[in-house]
Amino acid sequence: MSKIHVLDQNTINQIAAGEVIDRPASIVKELMENAIDAGATMISVEIKDGGTSLIRITDNGSGIEKDDIKVAFLRHATSKIKTALDLISVSSLGFRGEALSSIASVCQVELITKTEDAITGIRYKIEGGKEVTFEEIGAPEGTTFIVKNIFFNTPARRKFLKTAQTEAGYISEIVEKIALSHPEISISFINNNQTKIHTSGNGNLKDVIYNIYGRDIANNLLEINCSNEFIKTTGYIGKAIISKGNRSFENYFINGRYIKSNIISKAIEDGYKFILMQHKYPFTAINFEIDQDLLDVNVHPAKMEL
């Protein structure tokens, strides 16, 4: 039997990246959630070739302190929690501290960031987990991540990616879900130099629905706004005239986090079963506000189940 040995940190990060980053859409999700946690009111997502050659995400959030930049790319480095007890009440979208180290281990990454108090910004380039550049530059407040050549050093994993069009579709779905869950943030999505999504950030969910799904959907909605001592439910459901042959029209959020729940889906679909044809599913965009102490967001790797 071969001698047992301890893996080097870069190899550990590449293995771990497989659990966090499986395609370009995973990178977009993680970096958009970072931007939201940083207090951004504007997020721009630009991709080329389905995100395989370029992902650029720019926000106007608080930026990253100079002394924290290199630390942020270490595995399990996070500002969101300090101990396991903090998982009980964590409200941020990200908290595990795995995303940046995972992305940097399998991509070529350039970070440009500036905080409000800093005189200059910082550019940090890291490729395959190895530092290339760390320098001061002029930059606006906020953060830009430029991610190139996903899986450039793990070609076997790159072969499992779909076509550029399919990968772009996965990214578009992520951007749509985040835009629906945060109508107070202006979000734009640019695919191969063409703007596909742009929301104003005016806080009006119906405007976001119109922007993503179009006039026919937006004009056939019923508003939901109800609450009790445990939960507040807001959003929109579609009239019977709009339905689809799969659940892609169903959007559910808990405290602004997109989730998948067979229990919620089944309950909503049961309410429609006498007004929709068989094998048709309704449009929904519903947010549930619940006491954070009653939730466990750490039960699913992608944090999509609670």
Predicted region positions:
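N-terminal phosphate-binding caps/lids of nucleotide- and nucleic-acid-binding domains
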Residues: 1-306
